[in-house]
Swiss-Prot record:
Belongs to the tetrahydrofolate dehydrogenase/cyclohydrolase family. Its EC number is 1.5.1.5, 3.5.4.9. One of its GO terms (molecular function) is methenyltetrahydrofolate cyclohydrolase activity. Keywords: Amino-acid biosynthesis, Histidine biosynthesis, Hydrolase, Methionine biosynthesis, Multifunctional enzyme, NADP, One-carbon metabolism, Oxidoreductase, Purine biosynthesis. Pathway: One-carbon metabolism; tetrahydrofolate interconversion. NADP(+) binds at G161, R162, G163, S186, T227. It catalyses: (6R)-5,10-methylene-5,6,7,8-tetrahydrofolate + NADP(+) = (6R)-5,10-methenyltetrahydrofolate + NADPH; (6R)-5,10-methenyltetrahydrofolate + H2O = (6R)-10-formyltetrahydrofolate + H(+). This is Bifunctional protein FolD 1. It comes from the Bacteria. Homodimer.
Length: 276
């Protein structure tokens, strides 16, 4: 089984980001990503540190902003960043305050600065094939398949999960690559049978070990987007040991989709800065 190394792919994208950041800085522009933290969630703060560290290596300024005083303060913070000409990209970490939906928060992020595709308009533009930013995790799936030279045109793809961050947008991105996409979810009947017919499986449920050997046809590619923390550490949706003798390729967890997602956020920030 071939392991699709997200870290090496992220490094390749990073070289492009470095070059583009240098060009922007020579023109007097420092590409800047604002990360809004609505609470003290440890996972969100840990990921923000990863973004900061990665951004520092590729020439993008990453600015964390605390917005923990409640829903109104969060929206005020996003509005201020939206109006700030020095800020090129905005992301808001989750979980959000219970009183706010991702749609409500996303509507306050201008599409031009919506580098993680949180604004509903961004998803609409994606559905219509118009220019814009897709959610970075969904985009990372297609980026990995492209860089691994795994054909998508004509491929049968099973997407497990229909959420707005991965499932829905990745299905649209794969359709744009001429794949034949089936989206499965908690009410899907015969999930194992559907998955076993696929050339590519994309799983984004957060259920550890959901995808076992019975899901995977010989030679299929499996993209594991799920992540959960267990007593054994960080794990994905896929039982890697169970499918190792069957699958043709797999993204590991950690080290697969995650590093590419982070770098795509920074590449999107570069593109937003360049457009500005």
């Amino acid at each position: 089984m071939r392991l699709l190394d997200g870290r090496s792919m992220a490094a390749e994208i990073g070289r492009y980001v470095i070059d583009e950041a240098e060009r922007l800085m020579l023109a007097g522009k420092t590409p800047t990503l604002a990360v809004v933290l609505p609470n003290a969630d440890p996972a969100a703060r840990s990921y923000t540190h990863i973004i900061e560290r990665t951004a520092g290596k590729v020439g993008v300024r990453c600015e964390p902003h605390e917005a923990t005083a409640g829903p109104a303060a969060l929206l005020d913070m996003v509005d201020a960043l939206a109006a700030d000409p020095l800020v090129d990209g905005i992301i808001v970490q989750t979980p959000l305050p219970a009183q706010l939906s991702s749609r409500e928060v996303g509507e306050h992020i201008p599409v031009a600065k919506d580098v993680d595709g949180m604004n509903p308009e961004s998803l609409g533009r994606l559905a219509l094939g118009l220019p814009g930013f897709a959610p970075a995790t969904a985009a990372a799936v297609v980026e990995i398949l492209t860089r691994a030279r795994i054909p998508m045109a004509g491929a049968r793809v099973c997407v497990i999960g229909r959420g707005p961050v991965v499932g829905k947008p990745v299905s649209l991105l794969l359709l744009a690559e001429d794949a034949t996409v089936t989206v499965c979810h908690s009410h899907t009947k015969d999930l194992v049978t559907i998955a076993h017919e696929a050339d590519i499986i994309v799983s984004a449920t957060g259920v550890p070990g959901l995808v076992g050997a019975g899901f995977v046809r010989p030679g299929a590619t499996v993209i594991d987007v799920g992540t959960a923390v267990t007593a054994a550490g960080q794990v994905g949706d896929v039982d890697a040991a169970a499918i190792a003798s069957v699958a043709g390729a797999l993204t590991p967890v950690p080290g697969g989709v995650g590093p590419v997602t982070t770098m795509l956020l920074l590449r999107n920030t570069i593109r937003a800065a360049r457009a500005d």
